[in-house]
C-alpha cells in the first residue's frame, strides 16, 4: 500500500503543519476614537512579532491604554504619535482618509470604518491618496489597483517599516528552511515524478515521467487525486 500524499498529511494534522499562532503577539488594530476625539501616545518599545515580516511598536496612549501597532518608517522609541481627526500629518499618526491630503503615502488602511486596518500592512509597502470624490476617497493600492473607500476609514501616515526585506538573499538552503518552518510550511516541496512509486502516483520508473494520464476526475479518491484535476483543457498554454 502506498504512502499518504503531502496534502493528506496536512489534512490529518501534525506538528509539521501546525500553525505557530501561539507565538503571535497581537492583532494590530487602530485604537478606537469617537467623533472629533484625538488621542496621543508615546512609543515605548519596538517589538519583533513572529507573525509578521515588519517590526511593530508598543504605544502607551494618554487614556492609559497600551496597544501594539504597525511601525511606519521614521518613528522610534520616545516619539509621540496621535490618532484622531485633528492629528498632524506626519509618519505614525492615524487619521480618517477625508483628512489626509492627496498624494500622501499611507498604510494600514481600513476597509470599513472601525475594522482596525486591512490594506497595505506588509513590510515596505504603502498606498497613495489619489483624490477625494464626493462620498468616496480614491486610493491607489501597493498593487496598483484603484479602490474607492469610505472617507471615514482610517489610515496611518507613512510607509510600513522593514522595506528591502526581500532584497536580501537567503544564500543557504538552511536559512530558507528555518524561514518556512516559522510559517508552518513544509519545505522543500519534492516533485511527484522525483519520488518513489510508493510515495506518489507519478513516482518510480527509470526516468522522470508521470507514467499515466495527468488528468483525473473530480471524484477521484484521495491518494490518487493528483495532476490536472477535472481539467477542461490541457497542453501548452493551459
Swiss-Prot record:
Gene: rpl2
A Gene Ontology term for the protein's cellular component: cytosolic large ribosomal subunit
Matching PROSITE patterns: RIBOSOMAL_L2
The organism's place on the tree of life at top rank: Archaea
Function: One of the primary rRNA binding proteins. Required for association of the 30S and 50S subunits to form the 70S ribosome, for tRNA binding and peptide bond formation. It has been suggested to have peptidyltransferase activity; this is somewhat controversial. Makes several contacts with the 16S rRNA in the 70S ribosome.
Matching Gene3D superfamilies: 2.30.30.30, Nucleic acid-binding proteins, Ribosomal protein L2, domain 3
Residues covered by region (Disordered): 201-238
GO BP of this protein: cytoplasmic translation
Listed InterPro entries: NA-bd_OB-fold, Rib_uL2_dom2, Ribosomal_uL2, Ribosomal_uL2_arc_euk, Ribosomal_uL2_C, Ribosomal_uL2_CS, Ribosomal_uL2_dom3, Ribosomal_uL2_RNA-bd_dom
NCBIfam families: PRK09612.1 (NF007180)
Protein name: Large ribosomal subunit protein uL2
Organism: Methanocella arvoryzae (strain DSM 22066 / NBRC 105507 / MRE50)
Family as reported in the entry's similarity comment: Belongs to the universal ribosomal protein uL2 family.
UniProt subunit comment: Part of the 50S ribosomal subunit. Forms a bridge to the 30S subunit in the 70S ribosome.
GO MF term list: rRNA binding; structural constituent of ribosome
Keywords per UniProt: Ribonucleoprotein, Ribosomal protein, RNA-binding, rRNA-binding
